[in-house]
Amino acid sequence: MQEGKISQIIGPVVDVDFQEGGLPAILDALTVARPDGTKLVLETQQHLGEERVRTISMDATDGLVRGMPVINTGKPIQVPVGPNVLGRMLNVVGDPIDGKGPVKSEKSYSIHRPTPKFDVLSTKSEMFETGIKVIDLLEPYSRGGKTGLFGGAGVGKTVLIMELINNIAKQQSGFSVFAGVGERTREGNDLWEEMKESGVIDKTALVFGQMNEPPGARARVALTGLSIAEYFRDEENRDVLLFIDNIFRFTQAGSEVSALLGRMPSAVGYQPTLGTEMGELQDRIVSTNKGSVTSVQAIYVPADDLTDPAPATAFTHLDATTVLSRSIAELGIYPAVDPLDSTSRILDPNIVGDEHYNTAQAVKSLLQRYKDLQDIIAILGMDELSDEDKLTVSRARKIQRFLSQPFFVAEAFTGLEGKYVKLEDTIKGFNEIIDGKHDDLPESAFYLVGTIEEAVEKAKTL
């Protein structure tokens, strides 16, 4: 084992001198024994000459001093993978943080792995049902595809991702991996407790590097989660679900260390390597002819600006986008999905079928027409509209409310029982509203219900 010495510490960035035997390779893990007996992992980032490397620390650098010995492990960070990580909670370097003792895993993977070769990639397009009306109808998710949930602060990204975990993990008996990247520790704790209660925990591996962690951990924890998912895909030939909350924090962590590594910032102060870092992560989240990785990623939108480089870079990699809108959240419609801004590559009659496609397009055109009329309504009022437009507005407002839905994970807040709506019920319900079967029902009957039958029942009580 090569041994070096710490020569400089600048926050999370540590420089190490290696006198003889050459330098560790880029991305190799180095370890430092702390005075309290714990081990700190550093990741090599740059060679600063013939004897010095610059590294990023995966944990706080408190207590480190110059001259401390550093050992080169000779390989990148290795994390435990396999069936034994299910039901466990790990940190970025694969150490357990759930207090249940060490993970007894026979195999470990590097967190930096090559992308699968082109000839083994799968090109199948198939929709998978989430039980959430607005998603299944207007921006269906594909099995083995990548989906992004975009939204500013406090519009419901984490609640939506929790609901998806709840619906998908319970309905489909596959394995899931959850990577908590730079988000609130409280939310991670809630998820852990909720999973234990619902019994989903035995099929899930959780990897956390939350807000309180140094940027090195936040920049790498998504890769740790991905390596665990890749094991199930490649060696057990399974369909795996990978949830990442939040991809923006991955970019943000990269930007935090970029300047300390001596790089010139690029647009809006982000790291110049933004596109490469995002590409290296997203390019590994693929499906092969052995198994699939279906990923759902929450993506924070700084100041509600979708053109910010961080969300804009993520957009290009996704198969479906669910955009959460503050204006819809203000109307009290949850999930606050913007039906006109959200997209999906598989909303195609050849994949989802003609009925689904036509219903989705009819819903979108009604909502678009309502949006166009809103200026007239605001200035002149409803009375100035033609009878046809009044009917359009009435149906569009019903559709808007029918796109809301009570969530299982939000039962404590709404006091309403969560609903899982099957795709055929979703299509049937929206078709009936478009065809005018429910023109006589009040708008409020459609708010926070599951199927159209529930809306009819609710109308009787109003």
UniProtKB/Swiss-Prot annotation:
SUPFAM superfamilies membership: C-terminal domain of alpha and beta subunits of F1 ATP synthase, N-terminal domain of alpha and beta subunits of F1 ATP synthase, P-loop containing nucleoside triphosphate hydrolases
GO annotation, cellular component aspect: plasma membrane; proton-transporting ATP synthase complex
InterPro entries according to UniProt: AAA+_ATPase (IPR003593), ATP-synt_VA_C (IPR055190), ATP_synth_F1_bsu (IPR005722), ATPase_a/bsu_AS (IPR020003), ATPase_alpha/beta_chains (IPR050053), ATPase_F1/V1/A1_a/bsu_N (IPR004100), ATPase_F1/V1/A1_a/bsu_N_sf (IPR036121), ATPase_F1/V1/A1_a/bsu_nucl-bd (IPR000194)
Top EC class, one word: translocase
Reaction catalyzed: ATP + H2O + 4 H(+)(in) = ADP + phosphate + 5 H(+)(out)
Domain of life, source organism: Bacteria
Major location category of this protein: membrane
EC assignment: 7.1.2.2
Bilayer disposition of the protein: Peripheral membrane protein
Disulfide bond sites: none
Positions with a binding annotation for ATP: 151-158
Database matches in NCBIfam families: atpD
HAMAP family: ATP_synth_beta_bact (MF_01347)
Subunit structure: F-type ATPases have 2 components, CF(1) - the catalytic core - and CF(0) - the membrane proton channel. CF(1) has five subunits: alpha(3), beta(3), gamma(1), delta(1), epsilon(1). CF(0) has four main subunits: a(1), b(1), b'(1) and c(9-12).
Biological role: Produces ATP from ADP in the presence of a proton gradient across the membrane. The catalytic sites are hosted primarily by the beta subunits.
Recorded family membership: Belongs to the ATPase alpha/beta chains family.
Name this protein carries in UniProt: ATP synthase subunit beta
